[in-house]
Amino acid sequence: YENVPGMLNHDKGNTWKVISEIFDSLNYSWKLYSLKATDFGIPQNRTRIFVLGFKNSLGIDPNDIVLETKELDVEVKDFLEEYVDDKYYHGEKGFKWITKPLSLKKRVSINSKIARTQAANQQFNWCGDMIFESNPTRIFPSRVYHGEFNGEYGVARKLTPRECLRLMGFSDKFKIVVPDQQMYRQAGNSIVVNVLESIIKGVIKTGVFEK
């Protein structure tokens, strides 16, 4: 089971109470995890809750599962494409929206090494970080701006579908076969691959598939 952390407080905790009681009624031994993408090598502030459970008859204690973590040794810029199509750069309207004082105040940081949570329905596909770059070419390391829209370069751009997938742990071998908007939604709704891999490895080590 996977969900956002806020689910635990939904309806003053009653929703989670019902769900957990159902797990118990189905005779499962289970454990609740709160896992951050940054603890698994992905530079994105994305925390999700997971429930790992086994039928009581299997005799497996979920508390014995050890999830392998990975030190964060990369930054957002390491996940960006070198060459980006012009269509991903915002026009004047988008540029003014993300650089206005009110929008900037909502952003946690500038030149951040970790991206904010990728959402499926975010306007302008904003990753939450702004980087000041003096490069006079159209090749930018991230969403960048120089302070004013000049219609040629120094404008802000959104993350590409490939960059969003990378920030979710997908390798470039993953084929993009749907339009950009659908890909943004799929990436935002996905589970970080690195986290899921660690969970699966932990489950396999319990020997559950040998029983």
List each model region and its residues:
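Class I S-adenosyl-L-methionine
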Residues: 1-125, 132-138
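C-terminal target-recognition/interaction regions appended to catalytic cores
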Residues: 88-211
